[in-house]
UniProtKB/Swiss-Prot annotation:
Protein name (Swiss-Prot/TrEMBL): Golgi membrane protein 1
Gene (UniProt): GOLM1
The organism's taxonomic lineage, starting at the top: Eukaryota, Metazoa, Chordata, Craniata, Vertebrata
Protein's job: Unknown. Cellular response protein to viral infection.
Compositionally biased tracts (Acidic residues): 350-360
Positions glycosylated per UniProt: N109, N144, N398
One Gene Ontology biological process: regulation of lipid metabolic process
Modified residues (Phosphoserine): S187, S309
Coiled-coil region(s): 40-205
Record organism: Homo sapiens
Gly residues: bias regions: 286-295
Conditions for induction: Up-regulated in response to viral infection. Induced by the E1A adenoviral protein.
């Protein structure tokens, strides 16, 4: 039974085997198809790769050619670079030499410049010191100028006061002289009247004798009348002349006293020339007719003026002692003072050479004001000259620096 069953099964198995075989054949065919398709693809790829290799070889040959060309060019460029580098090195060496030379020159210039700077610094310090001294001198000069201006104003006020006093004294003397002249005229009139009376008495005594001799009586009184008329007509004339002479004399004395008062401060300030003093002393003082009396009357007033002028320097001594002037400025101020004194003396000589006419107070004050202005102008000019000289010196020093 068992055998029969297995036989049956073996009778049924071939179709399955066939199916399996067909399936295997199909699978194998599919695999073959796949493999053949892959091989075709691979062949195509191989062909492509071969083409690429050929192309790469061709390109490689071209690249090698280009490489050779580039190497030649590189060698040429290297040679050029070597040449350029050698020329550059030569230029650098030359530039370095020039730089070193210039550096040495600049170092020398710097050293000389430093020396000059030190010298200029020393000069600047000295100039600053000199400038400070000059400023001190300028301040001292200004102080001295202010002191001199104060002193000059004080002298002017004293001169004006002295002139007023002298004028008052002159007016008093004019009044005294006029009174004396009137008294002298009156005394002369009295003496002449007494003389005439004595003559009339002397003539009246021999009158009877003349009548006895038969001389006319009317002639004598006519002569007496003429004499009296002449004496009366002549008596007023001397009085007017005396008054005029006295006025002229007083005016001359006033002018001479003013000259003496003006000369005294100048003598105190600067010594005059000996010839100038002799001219002042030799000038005539008296007037007409009353020369001796004029000189005698003038001496006490001149002495009073001299005493006042001598007292004034004693009062002004401390102020003068306070004025401290350097040596250079003393010489400049002495030169300026000598020029001013010469101009003043010339003005006084011109004033004395003119006719001795009476001047009013306004004229005198105007003359004094003119002198003050002239002196102020001289002071301003001196200051301008000093400043100009200082500026010129500074400019010269700046140019030298």
């Amino acid at each position: 039974m068992m055998g029969l069953g297995n036989g049956r099964r073996s009778m049924k198995s071939p179709p399955l085997v066939l199916a399996a075989l067909v399936a295997c054949i199909i699978v194998l065919g599919f695999n073959y198809w796949i493999a053949s398709s892959r091989s075709v693809d691979l062949q195509t790829r191989i062909m492509e790769l071969e083409g690429r290799v050929r192309r790469a070889a061709a390109e490689r040959g071209a690249v090698e050619l280009k490489k050779n060309e580039f190497q030649g060019e590189l060698e040429k460029q290297r040679e050029q670079l070597d040449k350029i580098q050698s020329s550059h090195n030569f230029q650098l060496e030359s530039v370095n030499k020039l730089y070193q030379d210039e550096k040495a020159v600049l170092v020398n210039n710097i050293t000389t410049g430093e020396r000059l700077i030190r010298v200029l610094q020393d000069q600047l310090k000295t100039l600053q010191r000199n400038y400070g001294r000059l400023q001190q001198d300028v301040l001292q000069f200004q102080k001295n100028q202010t002191n001199l201006e104060r002193k000059f104003s004080y002298d002017l006020s004293q001169c004006i006061n002295q002139m007023k006093e002298v004028k008052e004294q002159c007016e008093e003397r004019i009044e005294e002289v006029t009174k004396k002249g009137n008294e002298a005229v009156a005394s002369r009139d009295l003496s002449e009247n007494n003389d005439q009376r004595q003559q009339l008495q002397a003539l009246s005594e021999p009158q009877p004798r003349l009548q006895a001799a038969g001389l006319p009586h009317t002639e004598v009184p006519q002569g007496k009348g003429n004499v009296l008329g002449n004496s009366k007509s002549q008596t007023p004339a001397p009085s007017s002349e005396v008054v005029l002479d006295s006025k002229r004399q007083v005016e001359k004395e006033e002018t001479n006293e003013i000259q003496v008062v003006n000369e005294e401060p100048q003598r105190d300030r600067l010594p005059q020339e000996p010839g100038r003093e002799q001219v002042v002393e030799d000038r005539p003082v008296g007037g007409r007719g009353f020369g001796g009396a004029g000189e005698l009357g003038q001496t006490p007033q001149v002495q009073a003026a001299l005493s006042v002028s001598q007292e004034n320097p004693e009062m002004e001594g401390p102020e003068r002692d306070q004025l401290v002037i350097p040596d250079g400025q003393e010489e400049e101020q002495e030169a300026a003072g000598e020029g001013r004194n010469q101009q003043k003396l010339r003005g006084e000589d011109d004033y004395n050479m003119d006719e001795n006419e009476a001047e009013s107070e306004t004229d005198k004050q105007a003359a004094l004001a003119g002198n003050d202005r002239n002196i102020d102008v001289f002071n301003v000019e001196d200051q301008k000259r000093d400043t100009i000289n200082l500026l010129d010196q500074r400019e010269k020093r700046n140019h030298t620096l």
